[in-house]
């Protein structure tokens, strides 16, 4: 009987056996877009700065972050961190605490006195920015880094815009706000406070500006047609929050009713609680339809704030309100029932939304205004050449993160326009979804939760409610990042390859593959 054919190899080496010939697939580098990056309205490279943070190089992490967003200490406190909702780790155990690490980096930078990187050239161009809120100051920062002279006109007495007048101190301490605003000014940005722009064309001509970015915040509170007696005390939410920045605090009385269901209504109710009042929120829909974020509502309820659902205010008097109860119809819409109730109230605060003062645009040719906002093209330029707009002035979600992103986008387009060019954003890569990941590499690691001030102190002081992580916890949280879609040289492939087909090239150079021996195992 014939023996089967066989190959004998030198027992000292198996190099002659090119196992790569068995391969049906081969490893290649394919960088995908992390879902957190895609979700971030400010356009941060979250995976990029987390990579530096997890190695303990906090300054590099902060500098990588501030290339896109100059306000990490602010954002670590007020951003609604939708990036965490998109985080792939949330399908493995819990999402990475991106916002808490950003909070830590922002505070670390302030503690260590790190400065923002300034311009290296002078373009000779001068850009006007109207409004010193998140969008305006973000644009000023990026424009200055491009080498342009920047002058910011702010109608109010302070920097910060709606971050100061729309966000209470217990969420955003004013020393943090002022420190991060000042860092932008220190780059050479000129700021003119108490300087309201009445006519944009006249101001541009008088200042010989080459372009303008309009970022006026929504500071005008919307009113409701509520019949009221002469002695009824009615105030809009933004006016109330603004008055909290002055020395003379508003006199609301003990029983304060807040009408509305958004985040501003929550902020006003929590502010009133800290002033010693007994706030009650009246909202015409159910909890499920409330536009305020769930965690904000939960925080308010923990502090003892009550909500009267499915109710509308029909009459305001000196010391009482008449409320009509609502009921949901078959389609889920609230309808009046004809059933009324009288509740005691010393003051009524309307938190029904805000509008932007567009008076500075009167007479500007080419501009299109619709539903109280300015229409802009993809490059964020209005219908008038050289005038760009963003933040609350344009059709978009209104929050700090979106405003900061608008400022950055507009600055890039303004810079290109001033150079007679067009800014073309880089093509977006395919998103690295959970299905693309080899999750068996990662052990369970519970999310680190930031400390919170106890409820008793929250009810009676304006101390910051949410604390920050210490270095140990921030480092742990950064290391929970899966680095979705990008090689970060974790060495797992190098360690598990039985054929030594993965070859290290050194820090930052990734790896190369010996295809003679790689069997394409997919590890």
Over which residues does each language-model region extend?
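Mid-to-C-terminal Rossmann-like scaffold of FAD/NAD(P)H-dependent oxidoreductases
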Residues: 6-8, 12-28, 299-302, 311-314, ...
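Ferredoxin-like iron-sulfur electron-transfer modules
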Residues: 19-39, 62-81, 113-130, 135, ...
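Iron-sulfur cluster-binding cysteine motifs and their immediate structural context
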Residues: 34-55, 76-105, 151, 158, ...
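Glycine-rich dinucleotide-binding loop and its adjacent helix/turn
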Residues: 101-121, 179-194, 200, 221-275, ...
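N-terminal Rossmann-like FAD-binding beta1-loop-alpha1 element of flavoenzymes
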Residues: 125-151, 264-273
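Rossmann-like dinucleotide-binding cores of NAD(P)H-dependent redox enzymes
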Residues: 149-152, 156-192, 269-313, 422-436
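FAD-site-proximal beta/loop scaffold in flavoenzymes
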Residues: 232-254, 330-397
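A conserved FAD-binding loop/helix module that cradles the flavin
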Residues: 268, 393-421
């Amino acid at each position: 009987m014939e023996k089967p054919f066989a190959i004998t190899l030198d027992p000292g080496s198996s190099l002659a056996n090119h196992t790569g010939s068995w391969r049906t697939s081969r490893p290649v580098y394919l960088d995908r877009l992390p879902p957190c990056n895609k979700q971030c309205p400010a356009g941060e490279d979250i995976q990029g700065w987390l990579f530096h943070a997890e190695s303990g190089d906090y300054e590099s992490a902060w500098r990588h972050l501030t290339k896109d967003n100059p306000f990490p200490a602010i954002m670590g406190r007020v951003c609604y961190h939708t990036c965490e909702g998109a985080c792939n780790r949330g399908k493995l155990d819990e999402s990475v605490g991106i916002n808490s690490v950003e909070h830590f980096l922002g505070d670390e930078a302030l503690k260590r006195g790190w400065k923002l990187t300034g311009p290296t050239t002078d373009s000779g161009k001068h850009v006007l920015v109207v409004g010193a809120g998140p969008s305006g100051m973000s644009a000023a920062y990026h424009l200055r880094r491009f080498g342009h002279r920047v002058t910011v006109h702010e109608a109010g007495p302070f920097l910060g815009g709606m971050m100061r007048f729309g966000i209470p101190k217990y969420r955003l301490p004013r020393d943090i706000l002022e420190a991060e605003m000042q860092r932008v000014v220190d780059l050479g940005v000129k700021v003119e406070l108490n300087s309201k722009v009445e006519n944009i064309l006249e101001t541009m001509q008088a200042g010989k500006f080459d372009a303008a970015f309009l970022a006026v915040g929504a500071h005008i509170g919307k009113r409701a047609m509520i019949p009221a007696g002469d002695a009824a005390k009615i105030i809009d939410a933004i006016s109330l929050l603004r008055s909290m920045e002055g020395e003379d605090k508003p006199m609301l009385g003990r029983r304060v009713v807040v009408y509305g269901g958004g985040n501003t209504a929550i902020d006003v109710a929590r502010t009133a609680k800290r002033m010693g009042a007994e706030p009650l929120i009246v909202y015409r829909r159910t909890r499920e339809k409330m536009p305020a974020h769930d965690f904000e509502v939960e925080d308010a309820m923990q502090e003892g704030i009550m909500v009267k659902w499915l109710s509308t205010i029909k009459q305001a008097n000196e010391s009482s309100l008449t409320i009509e109860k609502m009921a949901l119809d078959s389609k889920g819409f609230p309808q009046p029932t004809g059933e009324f109730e009288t509740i005691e109230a010393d003051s009524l605060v309307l938190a029904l939304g805000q509008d932007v003062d567009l008076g500075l645009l009167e007479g500007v040719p080419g501009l299109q205004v619709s539903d109280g906002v300015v229409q802009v093209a993809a490059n964020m330029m209005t219908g008038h050449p050289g005038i760009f707009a963003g933040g609350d002035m344009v059709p978009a979600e209104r929050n700090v993160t979106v405003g900061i992103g608008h400022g950055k986008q507009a600055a890039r387009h303004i810079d290109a326009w001033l150079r007679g060019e067009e800014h073309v954003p880089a093509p977006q890569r395919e998103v690295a979804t959970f299905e693309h990941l080899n999750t068996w590499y990662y052990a369970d690691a519970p999310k680190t939760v930031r400390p919170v001030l106890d409820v008793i102190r929250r009810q009676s002081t304006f101390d910051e409610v949410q604390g920050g992580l210490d270095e140990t916890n921030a480092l742990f949280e950064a290391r929970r990042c899966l680095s979705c879609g990008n090689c970060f040289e974790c060495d797992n492939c190098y360690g598990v390859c039985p054929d030594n087909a993965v070859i290290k090239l050194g820090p930052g150079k990734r790896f190369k593959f010996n295809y003679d021996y790689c069997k394409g195992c997919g590890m």
